UniProtKB/Swiss-Prot annotation:
Belongs to the DNA mismatch repair MutS family. HAMAP family: MutS. Keywords: ATP-binding, DNA damage, DNA repair, DNA-binding, Nucleotide-binding. This is DNA mismatch repair protein MutS.
Length: 868
């Protein structure tokens, strides 16, 4: 049995788009068939039906109304699917046979344009990566919704790893991969870190020369001149652009610039540090609340919010650029009038980047254009407010600022005040803009007046008081009479439609005027549409200028946000230097103090340099505030290099090239790694990549293995960071014995979180002081957690016994290190074992290496177990 022509057409189109859900336009619905229908009905929770298609059995089918399709498409995209939109490209009224249909666009997670599918203050990144035979890696990044198109390149042994760190920073919605990269170990790690990202593997790629030609066509010959010797970059950029062209099936006129950047021009933050410092996503649920961005984001526009987020994820390392930003923030802090004038205008500005992109893309509707016009009206106010600024960056913004006054005038003259959403419903063009529009509009209005008069006359002539004139798209204009009054209908009424409780009629006079009215309305709608498209094209021609102005507005918005937050929270301007000193007086954690309420947070001092005090070893009880303090220092440094004021009484920040934050650990179930393996992997990242200019924070290293091994590893890492790397480090530990290292490592200083004991009660003061801890107070924490009294009492008894054995076991380990081989939790010796004690006392420690010492202790441990 042969398929119907329509179903054959569907299958032919589906064959060209195999990895998508095909939305196939049939009248007022988008229909899906076969496996697409089964999948869509399940994911969208809509009814699965069937359709006769010329096969023995009805084929599975489901559908959604075309006017409500966006919400259904959004749900599918959110779940990681791709949707191909297949439209009727011929008018069914004038077409004989089957209507021609084509896929006009493929919507993927990385190619969204509709504002309802996008997060306002987040970029929607699409990324492509490539790797050459020389192991150089290229990456291209696009945000179709804004027109952004950037490229970067990584070289050397760590190129792919560095590139994947950059992908983690971007958190793209979609990543394009070549087949060889899909199976690479580092790429698989990215899969685990980015569960919401769709990874699309390309079946085939072209030659670099073909991609260069494609890029030249989009961006001009400068691509050949600038990137011809960078094949990895050209490959990634070409893959990305080709994918956009293939999916969008139109000119990408809003993508006008290709810009290169280097991640090394910014502070480097790997995925571990970003996660642990909670810069833009909280550890608890991945939300913005509870993050540094949540505290600092007082932006008024969506594009300003996106820029501020990018600043936080790419802190500066150039002192001059940081000072420029700080100067601008300081000027805004000191001028409440300037802040209020700018903020007031910014509140009324829409997302210019995305509005301009939609105009150039050809998808902007009347309301988009009204939003654009309203936004442009506020630009002169911002420009005037900046006229008297003195800081270098704000002055430059003022000089470069384009108010786009000519474009604003065009939109003001042309656009109606309240246009409909649809471009085919008329009402787009303002009265007085076009003579023909005015004439047709008057004809339509006169027709409506005539219809009202006809209704009044017919009521009088027939005596039917509830007679009314109506209209629908199928039958046109009609006279409606209820059944109770049908006996009063005159003979010249011609029946047009029968309803349950009424009849609809037409008269020769009404038929004549209907042709005139509808003809005028149809011509008016078509003319308004064409005029609107022409006006939209004028906006598209100015897309580059709009994008530049939008970038300046974004920067102003981000700077004003930093100033407002600084005033609200009592932040101060940091002194940023290149001398390597980090000195903070009364520093506060910016997020914690906002969740606790201002004034409730206990401030702490910090001092680190690159010589005498480069490693702070912090001991103290759990819940004492060690982790909060470490994160606090890292966030203050990061904020300073963003160009933000900081939560402190005073701060001097020596530039940091990278921040590493190994804080806390848990099993990684997705990769099958234990807590200890996660710790070791994260520590290896620090060992491999930290430099003398880095800031390292390590919290509680050595958990997940025995106390002996954990302490040995912790000490080894401390020694390596101190001796080999020389970076500034905050190292917190529950191994209090490591405090003995202070006299042996020149740049190590002991700090502890202060505790106040009141009888059996303990008060955590949250104060970091120059000292070393003597107790862990774990039993007290257990009491606070609500463990049963019997367990608390028994634990206290055991602690007393174990502390006695610990004192008996303490010994000195050779060379520059001193360490206690026994832990609080493990009793290795008893007073009765005289022979063991004699061996310990007889040790010649000066001639033993640390490894020999540990082997000796291991041997003792085995012997003692045998004695039990």
């Amino acid at each position: 049995m042969a398929l119907t022509p329509m179903m054959q057409q569907y299958l032919d189109i589906k064959k060209q788009h195999p990895n998508t859900i095909l939305f196939f336009r049939l009248g007022d619905f988008y229909e899906m068939f076969f496996e697409d229908a089964k999948l869509a009905s399940q994911e969208l929770e809509i009814t699965l039906t069937g359709r006769d298609a010329g096969e023995p059995e009805r084929v599975p089918m489901c559908g959604v109304p075309f006017h409500a399709a966006d919400s259904y498409i959004s749900k599918l995209i959110e779940k990681g699917y791709k949707v191909a939109i297949c439209e009727q490209v011929e008018d069914p009224k004038v077409t004989k046979g089957i209507v021609k249909r084509e896929v006009i666009r493929v919507i993927t997670p990385g190619t969204l344009m509709d504002g309802s599918m996008l997060s306002e203050k987040d970029n929607n990144y699409l990324v492509a990566i490539s790797q050459t035979s020389s192991n150089n890696c290229g990456m291209a990044v696009a945000d179709l919704s804004t027109g952004l198109f950037q490229v970067t390149e990584m070289e050397g042994h760590w190129s792919l790893e560095s590139l994947l760190d950059e992908i983690l920073r971007l958190t793209p919605r979609e990543v394009l991969l070549t087949p060889d990269l899909k199976k690479h170990e580092k790429t698989v790690q990215a899969f685990n870190f980015l569960p919401s990202t769709v990874f699309t593997t390309l079946e085939e790629t072209q030659q670099v020369s073909d991609y260069i030609e494609l890029l030249n066509n989009q961006f001009g010959q400068k691509v050949s001149a600038v990137y011809k010797d960078r094949p990895a970059v050209c490959m990634a950029a070409g893959i990305l652009l080709q994918y956009l062209i293939n999916t969008q099936k139109r000119q990408l006129n809003h993508i006008t610039e290709i810009t290169a950047y280097s991640p090394r021009a910014y502070m480097m933050l790997d995925g571990i540090a970003r996660r642990n410092l909670e810069i833009s996503k909280s550890l608890r649920d991945g939300d913005k609340r509870g993050t540094l961005l949540w505290v600092l984001d007082a932006t008024k526009t969506a594009m300003g919010g996106r820029m501020l987020k990018n600043w936080l994820e790419q802190p500066l390392i150039d002192t001059l650029k940081i000072q420029e930003r700080l100067d601008a923030v300081e000027e805004l802090v000191n001028s409440i009038l300037l802040r209020e004038e700018i903020s007031g205008a910014l509140k009324q500005i829409y997302d210019l980047e995305r509005l301009a992109a939609r105009a150039a893309y050809g998808s902007a509707n009347g309301r988009d254009m009204i939003a654009l016009r309203g936004s442009l009206e506020k630009l002169p106010f911002i420009h005037d407010a900046l006229a008297a600024v003195s800081s270098t960056r704000l002055k430059r913004i003022y000089t470069e600022f384009n108010t786009l006054s000519d474009l604003r005038k065009v939109l003001d003259l042309a656009l109606a005040e309240n246009p409909p959403v649809s471009l085919r419903d008329g009402g787009l063009i303002k009265d007085g803009f076009d003579q023909e529009v005015d004439q047709l509009r008057n004809a339509a209005r006169d027709g409506k007046t005539w219809l009202a008069g006809l209704e009044a006359r017919e009521k009088e002539n027939t005596g039917i008081k509830n007679l009314k004139v109506g209209f629908n798209k199928v039958f046109g204009y009609y006279l409606e009479v209820t059944r109770a009054n049908l006996s009063m209908v005159p003979e010249y009424y011609q029946r047009r439609q029968t309803l349950a409780n009424a009849e609809r009629f037409i008269t020769p006079e009404l038929k004549e005027y209907e042709s005139m009215i509808l003809g005028a309305e149809d011509r008016l709608v078509e003319l308004e549409y064409n005029l609107f498209v022409a006006i939209r094209a004028k906006v598209a021609a100015e897309v580059s200028s709009i994008q530049k102005t939008a970038a300046l507005l974004s920067e102003i918005d981000a700077l004003v946000s930093l100033a407002e937050v600084a005033v609200r929270n009592g932040f101060v301007r940091p002194e940023v230097t290149d001398n390597g000193i980090i000195e903070i007086k009364d520093g506060r954690h910016p997020v914690v103090e906002n969740t606790q309420g201002l004034g409730g947070f206990v401030p702490n001092d910090t001092y680190l340099d690159i010589k005498e005090e480069r490693l702070c070893l912090i001991t103290g009880p759990n819940m004492g505030g060690k982790s909060t303090y470490q994160r606090q220092v890292a966030l203050i440094v990061l904020m300073a290099q963003v160009g933000s004021f900081v939560p402190a009484q005073r701060a001097r920040i020596g530039i940091v090239d990278r921040i590493f934050a190994r804080v806390g650990a848990s099993d990684d179930l997705t990769s099958g790694q234990s807590t200890f393996m996660v710790e070791m992997y994260e520590t290896k990242q620090i060992i491999d990549h930290a430099t003398a200019k880095s800031l390292v924070i390590i919290d509680e290293l050595g958990r997940g293995t025995s106390n002996l091994e954990g302490m040995a590893i912790a000490q080894s890492v401390i020694e390596f960071l101190h001796d080999e790397v020389g970076c500034r480090t905050l190292f917190s530990t529950h191994y209090h014995e490591l405090a003995e290292l202070e006299g042996l490592l020149r740049g190590l200083k002991n700090y502890a979180t202060a505790v106040k004991e009141q009888g059996d009660e303990v008060v955590f003061l949250r104060k970091v002081v120059r000292s070393k801890a003597s107790k862990s107070y774990g039993v007290h924490c257990a009491r606070l957690a609500g463990l049963p009294t019997s367990i608390i009492r028994r634990a206290s008894e055991l602690v007393m016994q174990l502390e006695f054995h610990q004192r008996a076991a303490q010994e000195v380990v050779a060379g520059k290190t001193q360490i206690a081989a026994a832990s609080e939790q493990l009793a290795m010796f008893t007073p009765q074992e005289d022979q063991v004690k004699e061996e310990i006392l007889a040790l010649n420690l000066t001639n033993m290496t640390p490894l020999e010492s540990l082997n000796f202790l291991d041997n003792l441990q085995k012997r003692l177990r045998e004695m039990q």
